[in-house]
Amino acid sequence: MSKIPPVNVKDLLDAGVHFGHKTSRWNPKMAPYIYGERDEVHIIDLRQTAALMNVALNAIYETVKNDGKVLFVSTKIQASDIIAEYAEKCGQYYVNHRWLGGMLTNWKTISGSIEKLNKLEQTLENEEACIGYTKKEILDMNRKKDKLLLSLAGIRELHSKPDLIVIIDTNKEHIAISEAVRLDIPIVAVVDTNSNPDHIDYPIPGNDDAIRSIRFYCSLFADAALQGLEESMKASGVDLGSIQEHGDKNLAPKNVSKLKQAKKFSKTKNINEEANTEFEQALSDADEDKN
């Protein structure tokens, strides 16, 4: 059983997770997750966010605990560095610059590009090998290497398809979602009020634009993965010392059976009265502070 502490509404509110988009930009499919509107901006129901976040975190935990691989995806500017930082922190994988078509469905081609990147690095790091090239040729090789690194740095040790994908901004990452659905890979995703929650196995209603919110999500995702990694290593009889010191992507080398999809989580309504009161009081306090 996961030891992940439950996410509370107050922390979500402090991170600005409740702010959706302008009401004119909404996706009607997000209606079940919307609490109301203020100043023509939709307010997300953080009671549902908290419940669904806990479900998503457990999915990440269980995946890594069972030696599965998690791929974090967000190529939007404000999330790019954050995604890479936290994926590396928990020894997982990421795409944060540009999703190349076929990254999942045409892995053979992607593997070829990774091999090309590895060879370029080996050549450029070998002074003797570089002697046979002109300065222009070396400059061209460096440019090719840098371009490949932007797209492949976070998946060069992945070797095969991931067992779970975590996405921030489903609109921008629609190609990644399509490929994951095609391969039956479960998806965890933050869904804003302008998002389409269809095909998302573990939806998390929330602001997918604010840096503070994105960092909050990623810290939770990474902590869940680290706990899963710790349990996995303990089960293997390894003394980790401090799990925070591990960032080696080889710690999760095995493929495991994918988690069963749980699309019915989007219909979660079992939220206790305490959470209701907490959310409404927090919004009231926020209004008072604003005034």
Swiss-Prot record:
Residue span of region Disordered: 270-291
Q: GO BP, one example?
A: translation
What organism is the protein native to?
Rickettsia bellii (strain OSU 85-389)
Query: One cellular component GO annotation, for this chain's record?
Result: cytosolic small ribosomal subunit
Gene this protein is translated from: rpsB
Its name, as the record gives it, is Small ribosomal subunit protein uS2
Q: Which PROSITE patterns match?
A: RIBOSOMAL_S2_1
Q: In the record, what terms sit under GO molecular function?
A: structural constituent of ribosome
Q: Which HAMAP family does the record match to this protein?
A: Ribosomal_uS2_B
